[in-house]
Amino acid sequence: MVDPWLLLEAAVFLAVVSVVVWRTRALDAAGGAVAVLLGAVVYLTVGRGGVLLLVAFLAVSAAFTRIGYERKRSVGAAELKGGTRGWRNVLGNGGVAGVAAVMYALEASNRHLYLYAFIGSVAAVFADTMATEVGLLSRCRVRRIIGFGEARPGEPGGVTALGYVGVLMAAMISYAVSLLFFTNPLDPVKLLVTVLLASTIGATADSVAGQLLQSLYRCRVCGALTELPNHCGEPSVLVRGVRGFDNQAVNAVCALTGAVVAAAVYAFL
């Protein structure tokens, strides 16, 4: 039976987070609703440490999305709607973590395996988002993860050295929040290895999937390269990747990679 005080705590905390998200426009209405549902699931399974890890991801990512936003927009690489994210983004980034949280509650014999999978999944998508937002501030050339050819800023599969600084920042924040706020005792060394590997490998897997699989289109009207299947009011022409395999699918690949890496570290280290 769920502790009624935990339910009350979760309701109050998520209500406060919802107001902050709405006031800062970090998520739109649908995105906020899905995020609250995900937060409730995590709160009642993994506990407050899991929710605080998700909140850290959302807050820091939203802040870095807005840093240098005009410059990002000028090169066509800024998040749409002023950086406000929707429900598909929430599911792409948080769906795997939600499944890991539920499995943590159901599988008594392998609870810590799923706890590490949860942490690794969130750390990976956090790292990927920071790699993008910090990397877009770089003045150096963007390189493709495969072949190292020159890429345009924001192009799927593009990487920068500064972007990997963002990965390290996300990993350290994930490590600190997990170590400080999870009620279950976590081995500091194993946790550090987990978040570093899950963050780095997850973000790299995102770049590989972005270059090989993510759909990239060319607008029939203006000729611009875009991730949108429709541009300037007309259907775009697919020039690379798998039709329909969008950024949210790539995010899910990143999240799943982080979860698998973290579970492997827990199992074998």
Give names to the regions the model predicted.
Residues 1-269:
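Hydrophobic alpha-helical transmembrane segments
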